[in-house]
């Protein structure tokens, strides 16, 4: 049984994606919503495709969040995680930023999502794996059927109508008027050009709702708590997204309390 306190929130959120969706959820928490689960660093391609990583030293990952995310991605447990929270999720927030670094094919048909934490820790050094870069024909060829499987999963769990993809481009400028710095070799313009193809696939292949953030709000925050990056935005963006989500969901039928 879930506690009485948890059933009295404005609504319950599951996050699948990066800090982009999580920071929006953080804004909504301040408005009385609760975050039930945060599923991060797991590409649609690696979901359901457990990877063999051998004797990787997980102690190299400094945070429990990074270790937990790596292990979840390693076993590809997106379906299990969504199944566990589907009945009490009012809103599934999704963004594609964690797709940006591509995937590693550790053996034929098994994949691992590249993450900043694992790259920084040198976790992939010595790992026999093939890199599939975002935006390449091979990556897109794998991502499209993975998207269809994801959509079918959402339909099966009755989550499709409760899912919203946040489509926000990387910022090219900061709150101080400076140009944003590249992230792992990707500039904002490069990343935005590549990511457009993936957003278009969601439009074309599914009926999931997509929330497009206005360009004038796409400004990176020089003082963001996670540091400087083209996808760490000023607070006004998160407030706008939260406003739009609450408008679009009201009146809404919340998931039944357990």
Where are these regions (language model features)?
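Surface-exposed cleft-lining segments at the edges of enzyme active sites
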Residues: 101, 120-148, 177-189
């Amino acid at each position: 049984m879930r506690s009485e306190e948890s059933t009295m929130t404005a609504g319950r959120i599951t996050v699948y994606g990066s800090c982009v969706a999580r920071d929006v959820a953080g804004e909504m928490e301040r408005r009385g919503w609760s975050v039930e689960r945060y599923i991060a660093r797991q590409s649609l391609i690696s979901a359901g495709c457990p990877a063999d990583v051998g004797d990787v030293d997980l102690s190299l990952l400094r945070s429990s969040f990074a270790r937990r995310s790596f292990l979840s991605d390693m076993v590809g447990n997106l379906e299990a995680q969504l199944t566990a929270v589907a009945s009490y999720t009012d809103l599934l927030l999704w963004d594609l930023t964690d797709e940006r670094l591509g995937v590693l094919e550790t053996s034929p048909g098994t994949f691992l999502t590249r993450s900043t934490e694992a790259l920084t820790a040198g976790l992939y050094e010595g790992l026999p794996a093939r890199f599939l870069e975002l935006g390449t024909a091979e990556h897109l060829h794998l991502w499209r059927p993975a998207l269809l499987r994801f959509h079918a999963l959402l339909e099966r769990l009755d989550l499709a109508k409760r899912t919203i993809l946040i489509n926000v481009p990387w910022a090219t400028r900061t709150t101080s008027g400076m140009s944003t710095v590249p992230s792992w070799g990707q500039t904002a313009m490069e990343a935005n050009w590549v990511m457009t193809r993936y957003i278009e696939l969601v439009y074309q292949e599914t009926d999931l709702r997509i929330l497009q953030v206005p360009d004038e709000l796409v400004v990176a925050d020089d003082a963001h708590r996670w540091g400087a990056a083209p996808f760490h935005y000023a607070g006004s963006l998160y407030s706008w997204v939260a406003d739009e989500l609450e408008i679009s969901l009201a009146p809404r039928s919340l998931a039944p309390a357990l």
